[in-house]
Swiss-Prot record:
PANTHER family: LEUCINE--TRNA LIGASE, CYTOPLASMIC (PTHR45794:SF1), LEUCYL-TRNA SYNTHETASE (PTHR45794). Belongs to the class-I aminoacyl-tRNA synthetase family. Changing D250E: No effect on leucyl-tRNA ligase activity. Aminoacyl-tRNA synthetase that catalyzes the specific attachment of leucine to its cognate tRNA (tRNA(Leu)). It performs tRNA aminoacylation in a two-step reaction: Leu is initially activated by ATP to form a leucyl-adenylate (Leu-AMP) intermediate; then the leucyl moiety is transferred to the acceptor 3' end of the tRNA to yield leucyl-tRNA. To improve the fidelity of catalytic reactions, it is also able to hydrolyze misactivated aminoacyl-adenylate intermediates (pre-transfer editing) and mischarged aminoacyl-tRNAs (post-transfer editing). It holds the Pfam family Anticodon_1. The lineage of its organism: Eukaryota, Metazoa, Chordata, Craniata, Vertebrata. Changing C527E: Reduced leucyl-tRNA ligase activity. This is Leucine--tRNA ligase, cytoplasmic. It is linked to Infantile liver failure syndrome 1: A life-threatening disorder of hepatic function that manifests with acute liver failure in the first few months of life. Clinical features include anemia, renal tubulopathy, developmental delay, seizures, failure to thrive, and liver steatosis and fibrosis. It comes from Homo sapiens (Human). It is an enzyme of class 6 (ligase).
Amino acid sequence: MAERKGTAKVDFLKKIEKEIQQKWDTERVFEVNASNLEKQTSKGKYFVTFPYPYMNGRLHLGHTFSLSKCEFAVGYQRLKGKCCLFPFGLHCTGMPIKACADKLKREIELYGCPPDFPDEEEEEEETSVKTEDIIIKDKAKGKKSKAAAKAGSSKYQWGIMKSLGLSDEEIVKFSEAEHWLDYFPPLAIQDLKRMGLKVDWRRSFITTDVNPYYDSFVRWQFLTLRERNKIKFGKRYTIYSPKDGQPCMDHDRQTGEGVGPQEYTLLKLKVLEPYPSKLSGLKGKNIFLVAATLRPETMFGQTNCWVRPDMKYIGFETVNGDIFICTQKAARNMSYQGFTKDNGVVPVVKELMGEEILGASLSAPLTSYKVIYVLPMLTIKEDKGTGVVTSVPSDSPDDIAALRDLKKKQALRAKYGIRDDMVLPFEPVPVIEIPGFGNLSAVTICDELKIQSQNDREKLAEAKEKIYLKGFYEGIMLVDGFKGQKVQDVKKTIQKKMIDAGDALIYMEPEKQVMSRSSDECVVALCDQWYLDYGEENWKKQTSQCLKNLETFCEETRRNFEATLGWLQEHACSRTYGLGTHLPWDEQWLIESLSDSTIYMAFYTVAHLLQGGNLHGQAESPLGIRPQQMTKEVWDYVFFKEAPFPKTQIAKEKLDQLKQEFEFWYPVDLRVSGKDLVPNHLSYYLYNHVAMWPEQSDKWPTAVRANGHLLLNSEKMSKSTGNFLTLTQAIDKFSADGMRLALADAGDTVEDANFVEAMADAGILRLYTWVEWVKEMVANWDSLRSGPASTFNDRVFASELNAGIIKTDQNYEKMMFKEALKTGFFEFQAAKDKYRELAVEGMHRELVFRFIEVQTLLLAPFCPHLCEHIWTLLGKPDSIMNASWPVAGPVNEVLIHSSQYLMEVTHDLRLRLKNYMMPAKGKKTDKQPLQKPSHCTIYVAKNYPPWQHTTLSVLRKHFEANNGKLPDNKVIASELGSMPELKKYMKKVMPFVAMIKENLEKMGPRILDLQLEFDEKAVLMENIVYLTNSLELEHIEVKFASEAEDKIREDCCPGKPLNVFRIEPGVSVSLVNPQPSNGHFSTKIEIRQGDNCDSIIRRLMKMNRGIKDLSKVKLMRFDDPLLGPRRVPVLGKEYTEKTPISEHAVFNVDLMSKKIHLTENGIRVDIGDTIIYLVH
């Protein structure tokens, strides 16, 4: 039962969503054609795209978060009257799908079908996380395949497929790559449709040569790029098998599928004379220990160099005659990268053990230490890097731990012959400031985690995890030349600086071990390949021009683009393995996935007219155009304004229709993506648009919005920990609108965002409550107040609605969706709740329905299904998808401020009343609780008391002189302290200054005004009924502070009224209800001087909560006040011998004699000690 209760509201929302989606589908709301729109372009068009997701699995919440930004933007721009297009393609190009299919095929060959795998234990994952593994990899260079990223925890592909819930019969089909293309794309579309995406699905397609139209489009793009000299042929880094003598692609690998080359900066540490005895035979040669680092930006902080005493090293001769010292394994890699005279040959000149070069003196680039020494580290591994490790103890936990070991342990130094002067003088050098960790992050974290030595592997792994990612994304450089710049922006610049100075080289090795099928361990080699020459000066210059005019919504994104344009060189655009389009002039090569995805947004504009609603482009073409007819000249005509009409059998009006679509929709108004795509895909996107339309800058991208990664409940999303949600799971759990609301609330900046499940649950409740309230208002239309909407609270509410429209409009415009949700839903609902509470005379019908309409429109981009449903409840004939953004009326800021003032005063009075009722601490009081006050006088000040007036004048003077800032308290205190008129009040002055400063931050400069902008007394008097009811008092009066005693006059200031509570004395009477079986009881009540029927009934209602309506209660008195109450009541004769009390009658109380008289029409009557009340 409880379970059902838990899903009722979600089920309600999901039911609405299903109905609304069918309605949109039937009405084809999101299908748009340029030919129909050109007549109505007064407000312009809006074309938005999202990087098509890769089709080797279901879409997850991370994808959904990024694409929600497109979705919300389109929803908003539709309301602003623009013609909106949001198309959605699906990416299948590249190696992962083919590699997975081939892996399955191989498992079936080896182990049968279904496979019977051996019971051998899976390789144990290394628990110690090596420094390099946590560093942010440069995704444009060493791009880990998505297959590796999504492999889950199973060693076998069959197991991975099984974890997706597939049966053995279904899994077999996935051994053919084509089946992946049939299976996952329809599921992606199904999931996205359930989300309610505003997509024109006719324009969707999958990539690769499976779709002949898209294939033809990519071939055209590459022929054009080659024609324009953007594509070159030459050496590029690739995984290579020396034994096989050729590149080793995924399908040729025994292990290491999806592994790519990893780029290091190879640091040259020059050995100084006198050389260690083992190297003495090489006198006259330049000898370098070469260290591979992923963190060139930290090299300013080198204090020493590490080698492992018991590891074998070699010295080999490089192509220019220098000697490099490193491991044999690293030298083998280098020999295929142009380091040696002959490719693949390592000319060894010396074999040595690490201990034989300990204590050698070195000169290292960038560091402030002139000489550093080779010291022992016992944890260096042979399988990564060069076996030589440069030491930066300021930023590497491993290095500070090992250095402290040597400093603390004299015996350890003695064992390896290390002198004190080689270790003790060397202290960590501040290089990077990391928020929360300071400028020596490794020192801080090692102290925090109490790391004792270099053998605390687990703690060191934790330390690295905590500081490396944060350092990359948030670290700020402290060294000259780069001071104040972000690490991620200067990493490449510093690397280039060292390479240009001859102090470093680029070195590559495989990210992980790769074994070829011939059981050969692969290396990274320079091999001939086709590449895009992104480093070419003119191309870079033009792309920089494009970037200048690009809206990035955030400075960090722009800096990231600028940094990328600074270091980006060649990008290999061809592979020999995988799925994709073949290079038109060299068919053995396939175009890789980061290269066929740069201008496909142009294909969206015409796809629906070419491929007939079929993802594979295999259905009949709506224009009757065959793929073979789409020659290079035809594509030129469609996409290039000046291109002549081609020789073709296609009718001119058909090609003009394609051209019209492109000209109408281009350029792309917004592209949204995760920030990790800025250094690769998004930069290539700019480059390729500039290359394809060099003379037409009006076709270049207009805006790019990059967002942070999505956390789930404040933790990283991960399948292995179970903290993971697919898109379809999220909709099942929260409904589409519930999920969308939480996505909007997750975050706006390039910092990590957070999807909080509790927020999604709370959102569901809010949405459900909101629609129920709307239904209630529609049902109670007649009972809502009509006539002029002119009360104080009517006018405040109207102003708050208009202010909400304006603020929310600005937030949507800037794509600050979390803020738009705050101003357009949370604060908007709060304004309604406040109005409902304050409007004691009832809410105004016109305002209530204006509010519902405006709220529905402001929320529609986030929760379109529910808003469409409410739109229908309001009796609107058309879809909300065709509605317009609400028009904001005038905003009376003064009125809004006065309402805020009213809420603050009410809050303060409640607190003061609570304190008044609490007995003073330390005083012995009677056990009797304090009696609640009945009356209150509120004192308001027209002007500040003289001491506050003087203080404020001083503050305002400083504020205006300091460009809107106040100086330190010391400065203010010394000036105020020297003023004779303030001497007496100094104890009060600084607390008053502190209050003003605090309010200045919240409310702005108006807090320094010497008078309020509204009439304080009038605001309180207009709301006196609300205040009286809210505090449950009998009566409140409002007076000026000038009428009060000195203490109040001195402390009362504008905007901060003071008050006095009191108990008005009265005489107690019995209030008796003689009606049988109605649940109303008899009670005692105080009657006070001047009371009338209304005040007594209100007092009764506070005691008898069963009475809801004042007008339903009548009071009567006994004709005989003495004997009447003593007679036994007779059923059916409740009114006998009693007289109704008129509402005009006034009660007079004689406190001395404890008697009460009633005065009515000049007649005075004694009422005794009992009154009758009747409830009808």
